[in-house]
Amino acid sequence: MSTITVLGAGAMGSAICTPLADAGWDVRLWGTWLDDHLLDAIERGENHPRTNQPFAQGVTLYRSSELDEALEGADTVIVSVASVGVEQVVKMALPGIVKADALMVTSKGFLEFDNGDVLLLPDSIRRIAADEGYDNLPPIIAVGGPVKANECAAREPTATIFGCKDLDVAIKYARAIRTDNYAIEATDDETGVEICAPMKNVFAIALGIADGLQEKTGVPHHNLKAATFNEAVREMSILGTSQGADEMTAFGIPGVGDLEVTGLSGRNKFYGVRIGRGEGPKEALEEMARLEQTVEGVPAAGLALKFVEQHAPELHDQLPLMNAVIDVLSGQVEDVKTRIGQAVLPARP
């Protein structure tokens, strides 16, 4: 039995333990210093507070002070913390990570370094490792696709995708982790998977705004939402292509699939609903933070702009929806519907 250590006991970190255990892995779950109350609930036999689902049987739990023990002898490591915590956790875990056969990443977002550079998470991890003096980082597998943590934990049918520059590694792990309810595609388009992962969070805010406008006015805004969805996929595709990704990745489960599920019920969508109903972006974010609901699309939006400015400045004017969401998040847009509409409705021929 191979050993896999999941770093991060939040919704996704705990949820992925279910298919891992079902697939026959020896699973370890390490919680950060922010996860103590989550591990407490699991140890009491309660449902996980974030997924409201029973926790997988047979998984060994480790507290934040037990990182070395959690990583000892691990064949594979999964980073599953919020994007803002990736740098710190990776630095702490590097001595164990470099001994593993592969590093999987379910975290979604960009990372900004002290010098202002903004990179996708796999490239960020490679830089962190190099800066810390490690040149033996194992292959990185980007985990993407439409996976709601609560449904994954409940063994509901779920499609995901493993993206690794070494396709053989992606296929190997897809075969080793797949279960009857957790189906996995394999691709060598790591970049495409990682572009879609944070960008769909940004665009899901706009989808939520359309739903919020409907709640506020009582008038359906399905047309606006559909146009927003279409524009979001287009922008994910052209941004990915500019970085060497397959243009079709955005039209598969990393893009269309993940955007669909996030736009239906994700935290980023619900944040957008609040804005569409009339709440200020700052106030809505504070309320969701009070409820322990992380809205990763907010920091991702600002970092996406910096990423574009650094890596694809020629695309700035070709990403109107990204720019519109950033404007809305600034709190300076009075007519949110008009601003989103300007970004997604076709221009006059």
Describe the function of each predicted region.
Residues M1-P54, V59-Y62, M92, I97, ...:
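NAD(P)+-binding Rossmann beta1-loop-alpha1 motif at the extreme N-terminus of oxidoreductases
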Residues S2-T3, D101, T158:
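Nucleotide donor/acceptor-binding cores
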Residues G8, G31, S107, G144, ...:
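Short beta-strand/turn micro-motifs composed of small residues
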Residues G10, S14, D36, L61-S64, ...:
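Electropositive phosphate-/nucleotide-binding environments in soluble metabolic enzymes
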Residues T60, L67-E72, T76-R155, Y173-R175:
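Rossmann-like NAD(P)(H) cofactor-binding subdomain of soluble oxidoreductases
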Residues G96, A130-P139, P157-T249:
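Internal alpha-helical scaffold of NAD(P)-dependent oxidoreductase catalytic cores
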Residues K200, I205-D211, A226-R234, T241-P349:
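NAD(P)-dependent Rossmann-like dehydrogenase/reductase catalytic/cofactor-binding core
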